[in-house]
Amino acid sequence: MKKIFCLAIVLAVFVNVNTFSATRKSNSNKKNSSSQINSEAAQVALKFITEYSSMTDNTEYMRNTKLITEKLRSEYFQIFADAYLNDDIVDADSIIAGQDAPSKYKVISYNSKTGLVVVQGIDWKKQIKLKVKKINGKWLVDGSGVLNMD
């Protein structure tokens, strides 16, 4: 009887230690993801998409913003050039990969290894993926929506 009682106590202690350890790991992962969402890279992406969506003249914004790479700027304007050459119109926004985007967003996730930032509009279900890249010590948006996301 003593052996069974001792075994039950040892088992209970072992289960509690494992549960405590798993909880600690889970909490540290939450802290890491929260710090990644608030990282400079993710905040640059958030600032870009918020500014872009609130502008009435997006082409002027894309021409002048310092938050994007030249590659993204070039791809953005290439879409309009191609449409003009083909006597076509651009009816969807390639930066948000759709139409009618909100003007306020929040960062959902950021992967520091891939540079992928996912944002979502406040009271909006659709998510937008952006790619950030550090160039000359400065974080810039290098891809968004359907542009340069390969």
What feature does the model see in each segment?
Residues K30-N38, N58-M62, V118-V119:
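Second-shell loop/turn segments in exported
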Residues R73-W124:
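Surface-exposed, charged secondary-structure patches
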Residues I4-V13:
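Sec-dependent N-terminal signal peptides
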Residues Q36-D57:
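Short, aromatic-enriched amphipathic alpha-helices that serve as compact interaction elements
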